Structures are given as structure tokens and as C-alpha cells.
Amino acid sequence: MKKIAPIHPGEILMEEFLKPMGISQYRLAKDIRVPPRRINEIVHGVRNISADTALRLGRYFSISPQFWLNLQSQYDLA
């Protein structure tokens, strides 16, 4: 049985949230008060989603911060 490659939370952020909502990485970074580089690195899969970022994303998108932490945990464990 072939394993499916894990998806980094940054890809989900980009494809399921930013693109469909028409939000730029820069706009998100400014709105949640983090450096734009942080969002860019998350989207490109070179930075993990920290608890702090999960809280900010959760508040911004009106979903549980646990959603983001779970995505990161699943990616890390794959």
C-alpha cells in the first residue's frame, strides 16, 4: 500500500484559505501582526506553525487554533 505524502500546513493555508479568500500573504501578516517573512516561510513549507501563529490564524479565520496545531502535528508525525 502506497503512503500519501504529508501536506505541510502552509500549503493548506495557501490553497484552502488565502487563495479562495483573495488574501495576500502580506495582508495576512499585517492583519495578524507578524512579519511577512513568517507567513511566506510557512506557505513555502520551511517554517512550522507555532502555538503563537496558530492562535493568530485561529482568531483571524474564526476557527480553532487547535486546527492549525493538529495539521502541524500530523505533518511532523508522517
Residue ranges and their predicted role:
Residues E41, G45, Q74:
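Alpha-helical DNA-recognition elements
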Residues I23-E41:
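Short alpha-helical DNA-recognition segment
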Residues F67-A78:
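Short, charged recognition helix plus adjacent turn
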Residues M1-I23, N70:
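A short, Lys/Arg-rich alpha-helix, primarily the initiator
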Residues P20, D31, Y60:
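Residues within the alpha-helical elements of helix-turn-helix
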Residues V46-R59:
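Short, basic-rich loop-to-helix N-cap that marks the start of a DNA-contacting helix
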